[in-house]
């Protein structure tokens, strides 16, 4: 396969490497991900994360395995194992559905490579279109609040919600970005803060519980988040804490926008209640660990509830910013995300 490089993925000498997002921002470390078990472990450990990026990494690995001579049955088994690696992120399923079609072809090694590379290029283009559509909604002098990480670290391109913010900044419309630290794994504090710093976008890091106070003071003009899955009725599964922000924004009459590619739509999922929510390890809540070290602050054996995602009802969303353009609440209510409109 040809050499390929994005912010977080690299293909070199027929091997897949991922940027270890658990080591950032203290260390920029690339890790091999050249077999299924290893990539699944990276996904579970969130060394590779972001719904679009997970789907792309799985697709690229399948293509590389085919280049190494794995037969169709072995590749099918690998595909199913990868498919189960992150149940909430529908981009993974959508990408692998396309790879499955390529696997059915007689020339499947070549077809898988072509499809994986096509998915990467499409993701870059989708991100650009999302940024263009979303930046038109950003008013000059805006103070924006964002949650988790939705930039180039999570996609092959400029990102989704963070891509919107970055383009709006280049257009001179962003006064400040409030970055939720995003407990418990601090993707905002570690990753989004790092990306915004690299892009030269002015930001201030806050704890998740500070958002309400800022909104009450009139310090937030809009909230921008990404999505891991969008149901047919417009409900949005995203990083835990997103629902809280949506409720706060609604109360304070602040626009709440969801930026995502159409590959994040699950038109056959009727509503948020049907979206599987991944439950994660207690250790993520009882302490913290990373390249900076490890510490535990909760009592040993403390009972923990740790869902990775929550669901924001469609009624709290001001607009869904897709690569096809901005979709309004009225359009969603009229069936814009229904199966027969796909």
From Swiss-Prot:
The record marks 148 as: Transition state stabilizer. Substrate binds at residues 49-51, 86, 187, 238-239. It catalyses: 5-(methylsulfanyl)-alpha-D-ribose 1-phosphate = 5-(methylsulfanyl)-D-ribulose 1-phosphate. Pfam families: IF-2B. InterPro entries: IF-2B-related, IF-M1Pi, IF_2B-like_C, Initiation_fac_2B_a/b/d, M1Pi_N, NagB/RpiA_transferase-like. Pathway: Amino-acid biosynthesis; L-methionine biosynthesis via salvage pathway; L-methionine from S-methyl-5-thio-alpha-D-ribose 1-phosphate: step 1/6. One of its GO terms (molecular function) is S-methyl-5-thioribose-1-phosphate isomerase activity. Keywords: Amino-acid biosynthesis, Isomerase, Methionine biosynthesis. Its EC number is 5.3.1.23. One of its GO terms (biological process) is L-methionine salvage from methylthioadenosine. Catalyzes the interconversion of methylthioribose-1-phosphate (MTR-1-P) into methylthioribulose-1-phosphate (MTRu-1-P). PANTHER family: METHYLTHIORIBOSE-1-PHOSPHATE ISOMERASE. This is Methylthioribose-1-phosphate isomerase. It comes from Klebsiella pneumoniae (strain 342).
